[in-house]
């Protein structure tokens, strides 16, 4: 799912400082 992927990527980017 694109939405799921975007959500995961968003979370990953947020965790990446």
UniProtKB/Swiss-Prot annotation:
Keywords, sorted A to Z: Amidation, Secreted, Toxin
UniProt GO cellular component terms: extracellular region
Location(s) in or outside the cell: Secreted
Domain of life: Eukaryota
Modified residues (Threonine amide): 17
Gene Ontology molecular function, alphabetical: toxin activity
Tissue specificity as recorded in UniProt: Expressed by the venom gland.
Family label: Belongs to the cationic peptide 04 (cupiennin) family. 07 subfamily.
Name this polypeptide is given: Cupiennin-7a
Record organism: Cupiennius salei (American wandering spider)
